[in-house]
Amino acid sequence: FARAYGELDKDKVSAREQTSDSDARKGNFMVDLKQVRGELAEQSLIPGAYCQDYETFKHIYRFVERRLRRAEISSYILLITLTDGNGDFPPLTRREEQMAVLKDEIQISLRSGDVFTQYSSCQYLVMISDASAENVEMIADRICTAFYKAIGGECQGVLLHHCYPMWPAGEK
């Protein structure tokens, strides 16, 4: 019997050691997860919409398209175009300055969960989630009003905007 108890005690000690090793591994794993989360998290939260380069915007767009297949949400794309007021490209001398102002107004006029990108030398694409078509039109009007106020009265009527609903991936 003494020998049998000795073997049982060895098994118990071995099981405790394995549990301790497992807990230690979990602890390291949790540290790793905290590190990963820290690396992924935005370090300094910039107010307003999230501006991305066009390639990243396309990836986000495709991700949202996939999400739309499962989630009951609405997302819209808003195309904002800077013109000369007659439907043509604005002169280069003013375009860069006006596009910089438009970028700032888009960023501060939207929520932090919305995303936008510069699509061309005189266009921005904006992705707006969890809003109705009417709300997206109101958002576009708010951006235009803020732009005209910031740029001054001589540039009224230079912005065009079009709103398009996003569809779930594979339903085009």
Regions found by a protein language model. Give the residues of each.
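Catalytic/regulatory signature loops of cyclic-dinucleotide turnover enzymes
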Residues: 4, 38, 147-158
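Amphipathic HAMP/coiled-coil signal-transducing linker helices
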Residues: 15-54
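Active-site loop/short helix in cyclic nucleotide turnover domains
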Residues: 40-46, 80-94, 110
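Conserved catalytic/dimerization core of cyclic nucleotide/dinucleotide signaling enzymes
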Residues: 49-56, 88-99, 116, 135-136
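Active-site-proximal structural segments of metal-dependent nucleotidyl cyclase/transferase enzymes
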Residues: 60-82, 87-90
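Conserved helix-loop-beta segment at the catalytic/binding core of cyclic-nucleotide signaling proteins
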Residues: 66-70, 102-133, 152
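Catalytic strand-loop-helix junctions within cyclic-nucleotide turnover domains
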Residues: 84-87, 127-136, 153-172
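Short amphipathic alpha-helices in soluble, non-transmembrane regions
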Residues: 139-145
